[in-house]
Amino acid sequence: LDNVVKPYPCGIVIHPLIDAAIALSPRVGDSGRIVRIAVDCHPLVVELTGNSAPRTGLQARFSAVHGIAAGLVDGQVGLPQYADARVTAADLTWLRGMIVLHVDERMPRDAVRIAVELDDGSQVVQAIDHARGSMARPMTTAEVREKVANLVEPVLPGRTEKLIRAVDALEQSNDVRELAEVVAR
């Protein structure tokens, strides 16, 4: 099976765009200086995630421009960036309006090129050849564990490490009791 672990809680075609936006975030600095954002992307990005004005967290999960805006402004993209209040926040709503998606038929599915034009006329560019979490660039064990911690800790506080150990132990044992105990408490 060709399975991967997704780093972001949204449509997978958005992942290279988010990678690029997060990489651009410290280089751009103040997002208020952005005049325009040009995105060269695979056709499926527009087809599947072309919602330019999401109003809810669910809609934003299928919005390429939301993923880019959140990555640029917040420097990270996780569940908090898909909360309804964050989706409708003025800074992200404004920035989404600056983003133009250009379909490039030659662009691989897990690649992107983003050019951010700033108010002084300068341009900051980031290309991603393979999205993090893709078959060509899978998440590391440490990244997967961090994702698990971010997802588990809010619902099973203080049990993240025990849960990870119990899952790791499954390879050596057919006994799932320890795992069941961790999640049942």
Question: Residue locations for each model-derived region?
Answer:
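Terminal-appendage/accessory-domain detector
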Residues: 1-185
